[in-house]
Amino acid sequence: MRQAFRRRGIDARSCDLKPAEDGEAVYHYHGDIFHFLPKTPWMWDLDLLIGHPVCRTMANSGAKHLYLGMRKENGPNPARWAELEAGVEHYKAVRAIPARRKAIENPVMHPHAMRMIGMGKRQFVQPWWFGEPFFKATGWELENLPGLSPTNKLTPPKPGTTEHKAWSAVHREPPGPERAANRSRSFIGMCEAAAEQWGAIILADAMEAAA
């Protein structure tokens, strides 16, 4: 995402608990965003915030883990509910970072997370909207931004076909140390669309402010 915006002349920076995969450490803050915020004054005057809060406990696919033995009739799983509450507070904290325009990534959430977060305007997009043959619903909670428009919409294959299985690679990712990272990775086509469409708005804002 950072690379796509920088290619369009926007001074984009990233922050993650992991190092930058592209080696551009000069534009990447390695660590907790809330560690850097008090020490980095320019972060309090952002034109655009694109946030990627941890969403594991909020995803609808994991709702069953909120209950003991993954069965609602067994009653709530206190540990998992505590994780959910912590995840919700983290999401809210990321969303509260001051910025003129915001796009906060989120999964297809279960109703408990939706209620606790108080979700605002939201759009869901798919990689195949932007020319990449994969299924992965990505939600964006948007503030002062339009939804992304498809740039190269493909035709999804029929369920049960080999091609459909290939498109479902994200959901079929096998267990392993890299599973979470691979499943959360942003697709290039969507990043390019965000940089082109939202980046144009940021550049227009800058031109208007300079006029």
Regions found by a protein language model. Give the residues of each.
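Conserved active-site and SAM-binding loop architecture
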Residues: 1-211
